[in-house]
């Protein structure tokens, strides 16, 4: 990686073999956070979950080195309003739909880094009946036995499906960036 870190979990042992086994890695150069400076986005699919990551670097003229602004599991989606949808690498629940837990990041220019502004998890009692004693039935207004736990800044929310869809639609109202990724060899 640009800062000298190794991108696979075995820390450099057998690099050629790891590279041969790995999924295609990719990069794009783009001003992803609208700060008028191009960033280097790198996607490493790797050979296993532990290798899979996406990075955002910016070159610091002052320090004459790359600065890491963001590091997360592979599969992020980048929005024109500056948000990053970042899917979790693992989950503690089972899902009957296409939901997967995720976090949302926004660039903090003062801190020169991306910070997590939201995290979302779904509890579907139909898929996980063992949680019935702890399920917040009073928050399940539509009665479908599905609730979304949302941490948004300092607020902790329990939303039923309609409320969650409204919240998500407002948050991700801007378009996805159409990024022209290139193979990293």
Where are the predicted features?
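Short consensus segments that form the blades of beta-propeller domains
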Residues: 16-19, 44-49, 91-98
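Short hydrophobic/aromatic-rich beta-strand segments that constitute the beta-sheet cores
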Residues: 17, 65-69, 86-87, 116
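Acidic, small-residue rich beta-repeat scaffolds with periodic aromatic anchors
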Residues: 80-185
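Acidic/hydrophobic-patterned starts of short beta strands in beta-sheet-rich repeat architectures
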Residues: 31-44, 81-88
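Long amphipathic alpha-helical scaffold regions
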Residues: 59-84
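Extracellular structured ligand-interaction cores
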Residues: 37, 54, 99-102
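Beta-propeller blade repeat segments, especially FG-GAP/WD-type strand-to-loop junctions
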Residues: 2-3, 10, 50-68, 104-110
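Repeat-based blade/solenoid architectures
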Residues: 5-26, 72-81, 125-127
